Amino acid sequence: EAFSNAGKYGMIEAMKQRELLDFLHALECLKTNGRHSVTCGGVTESVAAHSWRLSVMALLLLPEFPEIDGDKLIRMCLIHDFGEAITGDIPSFLKTDANEATETDAIGSLTGTLPEPQRGMLRALFAEMDAMQTKEARLYKALDKMEAVIQHNESDISTWIPLEYELNLTYAAENAAEFPYLKELRTMMAEDTRQKIAKAKEEQA
């Protein structure tokens, strides 16, 4: 029932097959568009890979948050980086207000190619995510940032840039603080970061 294609989102009409294919083609580059992180195998992480594992995180954590709309949360996680199909990924520590505006325009362009009710459903989700007024939006944002830190903890430390030694200890902490489970998880992640840094220093000594 949580993943029904009807109900509150009104998705009771099928997209025309060509509309579906065209939209999927527009998103295909997310499979190869790189992010700032490098995986444990030495491969540049893709935007799609980040969104996939973020969605898995959200799915696994649903029992911890019975008060939230889990369907909406997972939808947010799945779509949140659609704009990067046009803009590419920009690391958080480099992203400007102008970059944010460009990504918003990109989302508008992409969703504008969809028919209703799909267009309206996606645009409503993006508006809710941007407003950060609902618990679902704030939880998605916390998980989004935390997944990035988890990936950095998994990457070879030689791929880190200098500012990340501090950033990986603090990034997402403010977002996680609202949710006791995530606050504890973020503390555990920071300890993993400290241990990773300490191990690297020992190996260099």
Predicted regions and their residues:
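Alpha-helical, largely C-terminal catalytic domains
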Residues: F3-A205
